[in-house]
């Protein structure tokens, strides 16, 4: 990992450690659990193993334990990042989303956004771009010290 990635991870860890949650919407947790399970199942299949074996090997946990922990942490992170986006006016407008997607589509050699995103929804891309935008904001405003 490079320095920037380490800084981003440290900032995100500190940010999340300073957030508390009374509860997390079950639908949001389920959304992340389903997405992770689909991704893991696909990767496991590519390696010729089942999803449980894959998560045990890569994460040291059975699939159900990994999904439960991962989905809850990701849902909490999503809520916290959205709160920062709302407070700091960092939300991504439809126009900004289209511009970002068009830039990526063009760079990747696609004629249209639709060809570029395929089966993925624009909202999934909005979430992805928002994560990066808020993380950049947090890093820019963090007080970073070298230990």
Functional labels for PLM-detected ranges:
Residues 1-147:
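Extended, charged alpha-helical "arm"/coiled-coil substrate-binding scaffolds
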């Amino acid at each position: 990992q490079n320095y920037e990635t380490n800084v981003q991870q440290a900032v995100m860890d500190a940010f999340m450690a300073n957030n508390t949650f009374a509860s997390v919407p079950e639908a949001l947790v389920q959304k992340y659990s389903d997405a992770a399970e689909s991704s893991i199942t696909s990767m496991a299949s590519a390696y010729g193993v089942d999803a449980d074996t894959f998560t045990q090997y890569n994460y040291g946990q059975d699939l159900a334990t990994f999904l439960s922990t991962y989905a809850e942490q990701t849902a909490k992170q999503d809520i916290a990042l959205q709160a920062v986006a709302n407070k700091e006016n960092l939300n991504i407008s439809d126009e900004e989303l289209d511009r970002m997607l068009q830039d990526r589509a063009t760079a990747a050699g696609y004629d249209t956004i639709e060809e570029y995103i395929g089966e993925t929804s624009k909202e999934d891309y909005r979430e992805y771009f928002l994560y990066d935008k808020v993380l950049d904001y947090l890093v820019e405003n963090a007080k970073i010290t070298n230990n």
